[in-house]
């Protein structure tokens, strides 16, 4: 039986009451957002004839999502993070701003307070038995294309099991393992020694993967390395690079892959290269330069204020 009541005055009045629009006090912006979201959800219930059983299954799902702390995982999986990037790209295009280094999603696993050094850092603690040495380096350029000294380059990535320090369920990693902040040298360069990361998948029994299963989708990410780059007079850049050749590089469940952000890991076995890089054996090398953009009327209009773990 088809029931159509959404457009009745009773329902529209009720939406205003439920959203607090008829009450003094509260936050007007929150009221505006809740009214729109409630309206869209009520309309979806009517248009799709969502049953009470389906509705309460959804409520139970949200409870489980919160209990597992996976909202930050589901968000990129449903494309919300990428959509926000698309909106910022469109805003930049309207302002005539060209992003030589594309932005992409931050992800949920940044931790503030990583050890800081100038020019160079060793990121891994050397304890991963499967770790393959990686030398990652590049130059930070300013908005005019000149090397930028004193820029802050924050880098973080997973280990060979796909786990991040501070979020590793095995408890095997030390604090800030594979998390560092590097201040670029007088030539605008940064350099780190670390290990090649592995990609990861959503917890197979968790609510994110359960929903992806219903959508016929996998929950895998390719091997990747995260960046924040900031400098005086420039907008903070949030991006990440994917390791070329990973089977999920162009099939990332989080939709973070973008042209210009796929980097080859070049293998080196030459004894002279091994000696020059002060490593113990064969290693991989990745080179990634980044270019920043100027502030907009003195303001960083792309900085995102969101809850992040701080240690």
Curated annotation (Swiss-Prot):
Catalytic activity field: catechol + O2 = cis,cis-muconate + 2 H(+)
GO annotation terms (biological process): beta-ketoadipate pathway; catechol-containing compound catabolic process
EC number, UniProt record: 1.13.11.1
Domain of life: Bacteria
Residues that, per the record, bind catechol: 164, 224-226
Residues involved in Fe cation binding: 164, 200, 224, 226
Pfam families linked to this entry: Dioxygenase_C, Dioxygenase_N
Cofactor: Fe(3+)
GO molecular function terms listed in the Swiss-Prot or TrEMBL record: catechol 1,2-dioxygenase activity; ferric iron binding
Cofactor remark: Binds 1 Fe(3+) ion per subunit.
Record bears the keyword Metal-binding: yes
NCBIfam families in the record: catechol_proteo (TIGR02439)
Quaternary assembly: Homodimer.
Domain notes: Contains a helical zipper domain, consisting of five N-terminal helices from each subunit, which forms the molecular dimer axis.
Protein name: Catechol 1,2-dioxygenase
Source organism: Acinetobacter baylyi (strain ATCC 33305 / BD413 / ADP1)
The gene coding this protein: catA
